[in-house]
């Protein structure tokens, strides 16, 4: 069973409700139908029911819930909640009433209120517009200071990682993390790996240096981040700074990182900045013909995930399944 097939089966075992707010896009409507038919999640589309059904045509939307963010009886309650959350930032109640009509804000508020368990958007909207409501309304998860992202990389015919499966972070969100932020990314990514892959995380803090083979401000940041992560999560298997070959290849680890409990068997790879992470995941995807699932958001109080604007309906189904599994781990 592939990684995604396993995720879909897990989603079906404890069905959650996922909001798809971009109902003016046919890919989203197709995905909503597929998610319902496969029993992956309950689905809420946000928009005008007549317009959605007209666009859907012959697509079966039986069981899909539709909420109209422009004419909902919940608008005043949602607006009041948004106002209370944002008044310290200068938001007025009038502005809150207008803002909450935006399907992205309305969808996130459904998640905030417990009327849905997660949201998936980005087929039409930018990453910034997709995640802004989540950051403003949901905030970070308990014990987490930073929202970041990761990819699950499944490399065919690969003896490294967990049977060729890795988590790469951060490849999509935090541009130039400082040492403290890098430690937060590492801890969150380890939890994400355990949650989605179901194996023990072995975290490598990557650099162009292994154990002081080179010294610079760049390597010092990774060393400090490793120390901070160990202090914050003493039971976490984490080491650094490590070059990527020392991190994943046992023979190289023996010479470059003697005594390391992680080197040679890392399955969670933490990159020093967004440049390195983004380049690495795309190289792995293209040259190694790996499956890349992401960017998946981590660190939010409840899951909200972003899509590529070039996504297919099938891609949306996959991200919805991952979001549903993330929602299974949210503590009430």
Curated annotation (Swiss-Prot):
It catalyses: acetyl-CoA + phosphate = acetyl phosphate + CoA. Its EC number is 2.3.1.8. The gene is pta. The keyword rRNA-binding does not apply. This is Phosphate acetyltransferase. GO terms for cellular component: cytoplasm. Its main location: cytoplasm. Pathway: Metabolic intermediate biosynthesis; acetyl-CoA biosynthesis; acetyl-CoA from acetate: step 2/2. It is found in: Cytoplasm. NCBIfam families: PRK05632.1, PRK09653.1, pta. GO terms for biological process: acetyl-CoA biosynthetic process. Keywords: Acyltransferase, Cytoplasm, Transferase.
């Amino acid at each position: 069973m592939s990684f995604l097939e396993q995720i879909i089966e897990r989603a079906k075992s404890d069905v959650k409700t996922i909001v798809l707010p971009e109902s003016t896009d046919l890919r989203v409507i197709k995905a909503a139908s597929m998610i319902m038919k496969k029993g992956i999640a309950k689905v809420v589309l946000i928009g005008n029911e007549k317009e959605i059904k007209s666009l859907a045509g012959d697509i079966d939307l039986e069981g899909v819930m539709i909420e109209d963010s422009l004419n909902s009886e919940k608008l005043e309650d949602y607006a009041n909640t948004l106002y209370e959350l944002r008044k310290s930032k200068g938001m007025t109640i009038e502005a809150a009433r207008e803002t909450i009509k935006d399907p992205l804000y309305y969808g996130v508020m459904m998640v905030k209120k417990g009327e849905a368990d997660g949201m998936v958007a980005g087929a039409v909207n930018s990453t910034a517009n997709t995640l802004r409501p989540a950051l403003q309304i949901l905030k970070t998860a308990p014990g987490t200071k930073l929202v970041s992202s990761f990819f699950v990389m499944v490399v065919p015919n690969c003896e490294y990682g967990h049977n060729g499966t890795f988590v790469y972070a951060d490849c999509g969100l935090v541009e130039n993390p400082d040492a403290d932020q890098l430690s937060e990314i590492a801890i969150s990514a380890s939890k994400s790996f355990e949650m989605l892959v179901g194996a023990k995380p072995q975290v490598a803090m990557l650099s162009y240096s292994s154990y002081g083979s080179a010294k610079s401000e760049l390597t010092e940041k990774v060393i400090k981040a490793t120390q901070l992560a160990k202090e914050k999560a003493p039971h976490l298997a984490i080491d650094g700074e490590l070059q990527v070959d020392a991190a994943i290849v046992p023979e190289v680890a023996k010479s470059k990182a003697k005594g390391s409990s992680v080197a040679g068997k890392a399955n969670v790879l933490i990159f020093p900045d967004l440049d390195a992470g983004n380049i690495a995941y795309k190289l792995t995807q293209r040259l190694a013909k790996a499956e890349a699932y992401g960017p998946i958001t981590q660190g939010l109080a409840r899951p909200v995930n972003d899509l590529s604007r070039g996504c297919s309906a099938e891609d949306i189904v996959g991200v919805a399944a991952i979001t549903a599994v993330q929602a299974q781990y949210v503590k009430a």
